[in-house]
């Protein structure tokens, strides 16, 4: 793989693509975590948060639990009307309750997106009425907005196209969405919020594979005189490919990850045009490369992909689609593949490769330089590297999201003759990887090498190195 940086090609200021992040409720972190997180990867412009209606309200007794104990089922799973994802839920060791979870994340974000989920099957199956669901939804959102006034976006349900989250039809989801629409409209009228609530959805797990469902939902809402204020989709590359193959959409399954997301944007905009609807924000608010696993090696695999996805879609003040990597904190036994941070036995936190990748992207600053990548094994190779310059210091982030160990050649053109210090910060299976490398504590990103490189009259800086599969590295070049 050859990475060519042209110092003379200025592309404008680098824009941080990590400004949109996900929290998790299923394995809530300690109350101190959001402040720590923002110190590492920056304050979120939008943080996605959650409330689970079946934990907030017991429809059997009519009791509300405003500060509920997260992840503790009120009844044995076999006694529930529908199991949802309860089999994968364990109470987090943090013991964080709902109020602390929501307010601690609200303090570290400009705005919140609140996903409201569960009771999808209860209302669809007639266990509770639509009027009851609407009242519960309104009560929950009003309570959360009081705790966190910076909530702007309300997301109606999550991944209802799969079994763990309700397995709804378009008709069933549309009825639920209209309940949420009426509830949000009343709250906005009642309170005249400084930050009005906006409602959207439906956070589809496999949006391309179930595109007919999305079109039907939008068509049904339009017939009711309702438009979504924003749209939300998810993309997990491995699962997306499998889902598309199962649907016999082999041509789309064969696209690269970036290609699939661009295809999603294309059919989304076609849908809006077909129905005569205006463009609204599109949140890709769960994004990953790996499967959902507890396999240690999948953390590095996912991180390398996240770098390319964020560079492809996040480096804009007004992106076509807002990428939210999944996720800042989760149960490592179930989602080591995705979580950016871990809770250590002493109560401190450690960065996984996903956290290292996000932090490296966040910490870049300066004028973006032109970069070309040649002879890469990886797909979407144009997003495998980014270079910036600030005060004559050049930072270059390079990822190898392929299944091969590759020899790499780095060239930087336009350098004055002289000696340069090249500092390397490598993340692979051995370095800056607290998941697979026992010597790494994950507290900071440690430099892994310093070398001197001489630039002659040609003005070309050259360096040769090797990246193992799915490794990534940050190089810093400074005049000696």
What role is predicted for each listed range?
Residues 172-309, 316-319:
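Noncatalytic carbohydrate-binding groove/subsite architecture in carbohydrate-active enzymes
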Residues 119-121, 159-162, 204-209, 287-292, ...:
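Short, internal active-site loops enriched in acidic
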Residues 236, 287, 328, 399-402:
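Histidine- and/or cysteine-centered catalytic micro-motif in compact active-site loops
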Residues 293-310, 342-345, 349-356, 364:
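Extracellular glycoside hydrolase catalytic/binding regions
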Residues 28, 53-59, 119-123, 157-164, ...:
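Conserved radical SAM core fold
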